[in-house]
């Protein structure tokens, strides 16, 4: 009777746990079919706490799909190996892609902490796939027979690219080398996340706060207005705040007559993650460089540059340096000429031609105004954001026949806007999100990413 009770209890608990998992999947939008317009991510339903469970569930599902490919007893073919691999992992890919891009565009402390676990987890999962010898032997079997399988050009390229990915991921290494590579990849994943978190923290930590109108001498009214708005957003009404984001920093460096303030802002930017504090990245950079070299040598390359470029257009570091060398001398000569022009203006104004890095933007603007009578502020009304966007749309239409129309879909931030992109026949091509402005949780720079890439299955897009 005791055994029966224990067995009954175990069955009940298993049922309850299964129900809990099922309920979790049902309540996690990243694990559901995206029934949104055009299948875009349901940003209005996604919460930070959804990401880690979704990635973990995606990994389990992907593992089962890989296991099915490995255990398939049929002769390896394009369909049951290469195509099956290409179709696998969709749930994981969707969840991790949304997480990665949102962590770059709308990050927070919870997401950054989760990333320290999620990215190494995904890195280890990828290693478990690409370093799986049984799986690789199936890929290799198809690759070796590719010329005799009547593959079309797309199938042939996918086969070759799949094989190359396995090889570049370490599939040809010995078992001991594979274990070493796994450890390196895990460390690199963690260090990469920490580097990015530190940089974002330092970008957000510094502000140049100005509380006197006279300290804004030379700064155009439009730039002052933006700095005033930034101050209001930070609950510092009546002041002006400049940050290390390029749209805030570069205009100040270009127009401010206060050399000491230009120096302060410029040095703050230059010294990010380099002050010996908790966000200092020097040791992280050293460790990344050492691990990359170790990985490259493990893979049979003399340097990480040689490994990274082997699959790129340049092919070798020597080719890359040869191109840079061609550009270096003429670029240097032009820079010297521009420097002399700027120093001449500085000497005429101040009697001193000594020059520092934080003077460059300021005097470059003066040279431009003197030589070409060009004042960028006068162009501002013609180059408003709306005008520039419409100009891009019109040019794209003239070149490729594509059109853009505003569309109402879920977005991840109130400043984000979306457009449906249509081809010359007015057929749907995709959804384009615009997110123009810097903010504390957003990675700096001009960058873009894809939430869902185009794919065809059985001839259907």
What are these regions (language model features)?
Residues 1-8:
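Bacterial N-terminal signal peptides that target proteins for export
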Residues 11-12:
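Repetitive helical segments and hydrophobic/amphipathic motifs
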Residues 2, 21-23:
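Polybasic, lysine/arginine-rich low-complexity segments
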Residues 24-219:
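N-terminal helix-rich structural modules
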Residues 16-19:
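C-terminal motif of bacterial Sec signal peptides marking the signal peptidase cleavage site
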Residues 55, 59, 66, 126, ...:
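Hydrophobic residues within well-ordered, non-membrane alpha-helices that form the packing/core
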Residues 158, 190, 197, 201-243, ...:
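Active-site-proximal, well-structured secondary-structure segments within enzyme catalytic domains
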Residues 35-50, 99-118, 141-183, 243-283, ...:
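Short His/Asp/Glu-rich catalytic/ion-coordination signatures at enzyme active sites or charged loops
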């Amino acid at each position: 009777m005791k055994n029966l009770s224990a067995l009954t209890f175990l069955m009940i608990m298993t049922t309850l746990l299964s129900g809990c998992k099922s309920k979790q999947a049902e309540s996690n939008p990243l694990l559901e079919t995206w029934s949104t317009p055009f299948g875009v991510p349901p940003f209005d339903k996604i919460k930070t706490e959804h990401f880690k469970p979704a990635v973990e569930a995606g990994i389990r599902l992907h593992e089962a799909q890989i296991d099915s490919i490995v255990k398939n007893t049929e002769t390896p073919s394009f369909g049951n190996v290469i195509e099956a691999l290409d179709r696998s992992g969709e749930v994981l890919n969707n969840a991790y892609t949304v997480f990665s891009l949102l962590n770059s565009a709308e990050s927070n402390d919870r997401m950054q902490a989760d990333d320290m676990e999620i990215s190494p987890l995904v890195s280890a999962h990828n290693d478990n796939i690409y370093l799986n010898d049984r799986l690789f032997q199936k890929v290799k079997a198809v690759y070796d027979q590719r010329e005799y399988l009547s593959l079309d050009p797309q199938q042939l390229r996918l086969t070759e690219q799949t094989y190359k990915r396995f090889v570049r991921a370490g599939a040809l290494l010995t078992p001991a080398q594979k274990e070493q590579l796994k450890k390196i990849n895990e460390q690199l994943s963690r260090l990469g996340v920490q580097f990015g978190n530190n940089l974002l923290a330092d970008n957000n930590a510094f502000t140049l706060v100005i509380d006197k109108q006279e300290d804004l001498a030379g700064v155009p009214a439009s730039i002052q207005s933006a700095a005033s708005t930034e101050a209001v957003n930070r609950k510092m009404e009546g002041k002006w705040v400049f940050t290390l984001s390029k749209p805030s920093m570069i205009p100040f460096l270009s127009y401010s007559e206060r050399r000491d303030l230009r120096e302060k802002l410029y040095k703050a930017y230059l010294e990010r993650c380099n002050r010996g504090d908790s966000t200092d990245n020097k040791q992280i950079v050293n460790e990344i460089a050492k691990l990359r070299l170790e990985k490259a040598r493990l893979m049979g390359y003399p340097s990480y540059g040689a490994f990274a470029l082997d699959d790129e257009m340049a092919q070798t570091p020597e080719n890359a340096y040869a191109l840079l060398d061609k550009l270096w001398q003429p670029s240097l000569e032009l820079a010297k000429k521009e420097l002399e022009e700027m120093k001449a203006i500085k000497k005429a104004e101040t009697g001193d031609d000594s020059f520092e890095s934080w003077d460059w933007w300021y005097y470059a603007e003066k040279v431009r105004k003197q030589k070409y009578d060009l004042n960028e502020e006068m162009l501002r009304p013609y180059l408003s954001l709306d005008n520039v966007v419409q100009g891009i749309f019109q040019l794209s239409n003239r070149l490729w026949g594509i059109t853009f129309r505003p569309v109402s879909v879920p977005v991840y931030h109130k400043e984000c806007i979306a457009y449906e992109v249509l081809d010359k026949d007015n057929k749907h091509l995709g959804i384009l999100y615009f997110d123009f402005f810097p903010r504390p949780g957003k990675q700096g720079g001009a960058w873009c990413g894809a939430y869902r890439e185009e794919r065809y299955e059985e001839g259907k897009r």
